[in-house]
Amino acid sequence: ACDGIYDPTRGYVMRGGREMENHFECLWDLFRSIPSLEIEGASVLDEYYWLNKHDPNYSLCRATINQGKDAHTDGKFDLSTKGAMEIMKLFMTPDEDLYDKTIEDVFDEEVFDSTFWMYWRSMFAFENWHSALEMKLYFQRFIHHISGLPDFSALKFTRYNQYESLILPMQKYLEAHGVDFQFNTEVTNVEFEVVQDKKIAKTIECKVNGTETGIVLTENDLVFVTNGSCTEGTIYG
């Protein structure tokens, strides 16, 4: 959902954005090869690195209460030993033992009443009834940023919204290398042909400016499909 835009009828809208950090290796490996649109001779990665070295992210007020007053979390987690052990137990539990469990099944108020849980759920949008396995996987992915939860110092950001800072430079780079972007196009189906041990995409069914059409494929074509999105069905209100 890196689609921040200015809409004359609604103002500036953006459906979502990435909370980035040092270990987005795939993203950074890609953008070290994409030229910056603003700094001649620099890559998007250079631009991002220099920005966060010069102006690192840091919050003096992590949470508010009573309509904007500082909650004075003061960088503390307020986790009891029992709560810390519940988190450690989840971290060590095999994935298959968590398939049908919610976070409420593995944590109790020792965790839910802690400032740590407020930090965690406000950063990663977790609810108590969400998947315990997803919670564990997030722990494993971001364990190196636990110390940065109380002040947001774990996070890094682009100069502008991620459409203008990431998507647009990549689009310009690809267009300069012959990529043909088709706008006002909705893919409705991909037809496959299955022959013995081969499954081949034969036709992309789509609508272009509301008119139904199709793209005939050959065995030499590569088709990459993103089936669904975390912002699918978004509405503004």
Outline where the language-model segments fall.
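Conserved N-terminal glycine-rich FAD pyrophosphate-binding loop of Rossmann-like flavoproteins
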Residues: 1-19
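Short, solvent-exposed loop/turn and secondary-structure capping segments
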Residues: 2, 134, 234-237
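Glycine- and acidic
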Residues: 9-14, 101, 148-157
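Elongated alpha-helical scaffolds
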Residues: 15-33, 60
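Amphipathic alpha-helical segments that form well-ordered structural scaffolds
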Residues: 26-33, 119, 165-176
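Rossmann-like flavin
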Residues: 36-141, 156
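Short helix/loop capping segments that flank catalytic or ligand/cofactor-binding pockets
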Residues: 215, 232-235
